[in-house]
Amino acid sequence: MTTSELPARTSPTPDVRNGIDYKVADLTLAEFGRKEIRLAEHEMPGLMALRREYADVQPLKGARISGSLHMTVQTAVLIETLTALGAQVRWASCNIFSTQDHAAAAVVVGPHGTVEEPKGVSVFAWKGETLEEYWWAAEQMLTWPGEPANMILDDGGDATMLVLRGAQFEKAGVVPPEDADHSAEYKVFLNLLRERFETDRGKWTAIAESVRGVTEETTTGVLRLYQFAAAGELVFPAINVNDSVTKSKFDNKYGTRHSLIDGINRGTDVLIGGKKVLICGYGDVGKGCAESLAGQGARVQVTEIDPINALQALMDGYDVVTVEQAIGEADIVITATGNKDIITLDHMKAMKDQAILGNIGHFDNEIDMAALERSGATRLTIKPQVDLWTFGESGKSIIVLSEGRLLNLGNATGHPSFVMSNSFSNQVIAQIELWTKPEEYDNEVYRLPKHLDEKVARIHVEALGGTLTKLTKDQAEYIGVDVEGPYKPEHYRY
């Protein structure tokens, strides 16, 4: 189908109350959301410590932050930390299924507002968006009244891509045509840019020139940043938050260890113990997946392309196999690679009857959902984000969670607050770095320095009741570090 054949797109209309524009599922859910936010604040010591440290300084004053990150209760605490430090914020979710509607409502109303007179932040997010609605919300999040956004906080790179590709196409004077190989989502993306090219040409260039920097939350988005940088297309500095140790080794592993089985249990309520499980990928996320499922008594196998990760899996006690070797016997299959086409249509047809298939990587192309939808298989929705797909030729069925998108956020509520406190503390620090020290950053991808990573960890060690050993001056000199840290070189692998 070409663009000219696509049905006319009807965009949502923002609601406006008390001067705040927004689009959420139900603003009356705000009270429930506020109760959960208060509970989460207790479990997010890093963010609360940053509020206490910087509240008087207001280091983000003047920052207009456009945020694209799962609109959860934990994200609400992040948003209100950014505003407590002086920033103005507009927000959208980075996934069509991950929004917690009560959290979105609470952020719009704000801690001191009411449903009738909200005093919070502009949010454009609700659970169960269509692709058209998702990209509409992304544009709203980037569209400020008056001056354009000057900071981006991203998860997965969609906000960054929208700005960079939009500016690139404006410079070229044309939005490229659709290609047969483009996904349905990329066609929606191009259609949005094509519409804006006709109605507001120059919009994305103005935003790109205004943005002082972007901070990126996740592996997939970081990969995009490095690709933009390598191609000479990154026109503002970026901080790779994902590779901060207190993010990647905690959010990616320990957070996944908690939220994967939560998503499987809420989605299917099947017994995990004794089942054969195939985990595709053994990075930090895959390690958390394998550990959680093995802890439930599952028999875990792992696929890997990297011999180092494969050796780790073997020494952790897991068989390392190929998808083709294991797919026919697995009761549960989870993708965690950050790559595409990990589970193909042929793989799905080879799966056991009523085997469970889910993804915990950022995008929905690890599982070839487009091929499944074209295959003629029939889809029966059991409940939201749980679908039974039946192949006519064999009569076999598979259970697909969250349409191949993040099952821990689609079928459950994502990582717990304490883990996200680590990640989001890094986000706040990174935003402060780029906003207050623009002269120190070129249009490249950076990581936060080690002493800031250790600062985040120290706060959370104390919150859990841990007591750190103190080096003597002689001991510090002996190993070549300062008494107060950093304690490891940048190349150290935790």
Curated annotation (Swiss-Prot):
GO terms for biological process: L-homocysteine biosynthetic process; one-carbon metabolic process; S-adenosylmethionine cycle. Binds 1 NAD(+) per subunit. Substrate binds at residues 72, 155, 217, 247, 251. Gene3D superfamilies: Adenosylhomocysteinase-like, NAD(P)-binding Rossmann-like Domain. It is found in: Cytoplasm. Its main location: cytoplasm. One of its GO terms (molecular function) is adenosylhomocysteinase activity. Pathway: Amino-acid biosynthesis; L-homocysteine biosynthesis; L-homocysteine from S-adenosyl-L-homocysteine: step 1/1. It catalyses: S-adenosyl-L-homocysteine + H2O = L-homocysteine + adenosine. The keyword Protein transport does not apply. May play a key role in the regulation of the intracellular concentration of adenosylhomocysteine. NCBIfam families: ahcY, PRK05476.2-3. This is Adenosylhomocysteinase. It comes from Nocardia farcinica (strain IFM 10152). The lineage of its organism: Bacteria, Bacillati, Actinomycetota, Actinomycetes, Mycobacteriales. The gene is ahcY.
